[in-house]
Amino acid sequence: SPHSFILYKTYKMENKIVALIDADSLIYYEMGKETLEIALDGIDSRINQMLQITGATHYAGFLTQGKCFRYKVAKNRPYKGNRKYGDKPIIFPAIKEYLKQKWGCTVITQLEADDLVSVFHKDKTTIICSPDKDVLYQNIGSHYNYGKAELVVVTKLDAIRFLWKQVLMGDSTDGIEGLPKVGPKTADKLLELVQPLDMPEFVLNKYIEKFGISNGIDKFAETFKLIYILKSQEDVLRETGIELPELVTYDVESQKENEWL
């Protein structure tokens, strides 16, 4: 239950508990509301609920701005090329700006919010808040899925298995090509008896079996880079050449006080 989650986190970490908020989805959840005022109230309500349920003392929010590095990595198919965006509602930019101004959400060029919450995640002292399966299941620790309002606990083995399962399958949502005719059940079956340390080589060999050595290695590398969520400063430097600034967090109690000003 949410209450046991708070007790668990407080017991584990007596001092600072930082909620790392992947704020992209918040905009999509609220942009269909009748008025901007209702949408912004919805944003406040959702974030306050997150902070309360996770028992966070501090928070940091992140947004995606423009195209990330994965658009250049994708050679076989355009990254997220199958998404039908259409025209965004007129209140979309206002909600995004509100998240930056009111809640201090950060944007870093070339990186998705997914990457940013993951890079700053420190297992025992942070809680990732996101509805995104890749963010939740590629990171070890206790996370909060704010789309389903539920706690997700991910072990090291869970995270390794999820990553390699996704590399086998690809991700149709983001237009990422995997092995042909490999869905969740087939991927699970293929990895069933494979030890975690052997998974990279095993999956690479499956690509080589299907596409030949040269093509197989290229396709494997591309799919891996598109699926893999960056998790360290080294990852970020390698993929983008960017040196990340220090994490700035906001005090939850101070934010509550500001609401009365």
What are the functions of these language-model segments?
Residues 10-11, 81-260:
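Extended two-metal-dependent nuclease catalytic cores across DNA- and RNA-processing enzymes
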Residues 1-12:
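Short, Lys/Arg-enriched N-terminal segments with co-localized hydrophobic residues
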Residues 14-124, 129, 140-144:
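Noncatalytic, basic helical substrate-engagement surface that gates or grips nucleic-acid strands
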Residues 5, 71-73, 161:
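General helical secondary-structure elements
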